[in-house]
A protein has these predicted regions:
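Short, intrinsically disordered, charge-balanced linker/junction segments flanking boundaries
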Residues: 1, 89-90, 210-212
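Alpha-helical substrate-recognition element adjacent to the catalytic core
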Residues: 1-32, 36-37
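Short amphipathic alpha-helical segments
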Residues: 2-4, 25, 67, 116-118, ...
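Short, hinge-like loop/turn segments at secondary-structure boundaries
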Residues: 4-10, 29-32, 69-74, 146-148, ...
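Short secondary-structure capping/turn micro-motifs that flank functional sites
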Residues: 19, 62-63, 170, 193
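Conserved acidic, metal-coordinating active-site core of Asp-based
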Residues: 39-41, 45, 49-167
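Mg2+-dependent phosphoryl-transfer enzymes with acidic/Ser/Thr/Gly-rich catalytic loops
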Residues: 138-212
Length: 212
């Protein structure tokens, strides 16, 4: 809806590439949701680690605690979470048989590496585990990533993959940079991404995309 409000047309990818939507019609072209039992499995790991957790359906999200971090997230993203405190999110997901597109943990930046590694160890063989910011650890379907989204869009528009360009700033962008003909890590990118991708000498605040 927000892309439509801006007058944009074409396709938009979300939830780490597991959902691709036609902006004008709202039609889902790709919908790689997690079945309720798999989403609950992820939630139980997050619950064991006592993490601030969000679970996302297609158009809303549920969260296990109301705190300052959630208020800031809601303000920045202009969204409103459904706070669930009467039962674990794993129980809610199973009870409602929710189709979950993403499970996310909000963490302190200084704890991100440790928590990411713990989640990766527990879930990495079965699910796609990544992080998208200094304080966000995310888990989605292993079958999808921003890389699969780039390949889908290139095929959809009839553009050879070697003629595509992608730019990113965090680890969740790596599959996209690897899939594209030219993949660039902007100047302010996470060091883990810079180590694995070609660097570009401008930050996002310096209009890096416009200068490619």
């Amino acid at each position: 809806p927000r892309a439509r409000e801006l007058g944009l047309k074409g396709l938009v990818a979300s939830y780490q590439g597991s959902v691709i939507t036609d902006i004008e019609s709202g039609k889902l072209l790709v919908d790689g949701y997690l079945p309720a039992d798999e989403a609950a499995e992820i939630c139980k790991v997050f619950e064991r680690l006592d993490l601030h957790t969000h679970v996302y359906t297609l158009n809303e999200f549920y969260v296990n605690r109301r705190d300052e971090a959630l208020s800031l997230y809601e303000k920045i993203c202009n969204v409103k979470g459904n706070v669930v405190e009467e039962e674990p999110l794993s129980g809610l997901v199973l009870r409602k048989a929710l189709k979950i597109r993403k499970v996310l943990a909000m963490v302190y930046a200084e704890d991100k590496k440790r928590i990411f590694e713990n989640v990766l160890k527990a879930l990495g063989e079965k699910f796609y585990v990544t992080y998208s910011a200094a304080n966000l650890v995310e888990v989605t379907s292993r079958a999808y990533s921003k890389g699969t989204a780039v390949k889908f869009m290139a095929d959809y528009y009839g553009v050879p993959i070697e003629r595509t360009i992608a730019a990113g700033d965090s680890l969740n962008d790596l599959p996209m940079l690897q899939a594209a003909g030219l993949g660039l890590a902007v100047k302010n990118a996470d060091e883990a991404l810079k180590d694995k991708a070609q660097s570009f000498p401008f930050t996002n605040d310096e209009d890096a995309i416009g200068k490619i």
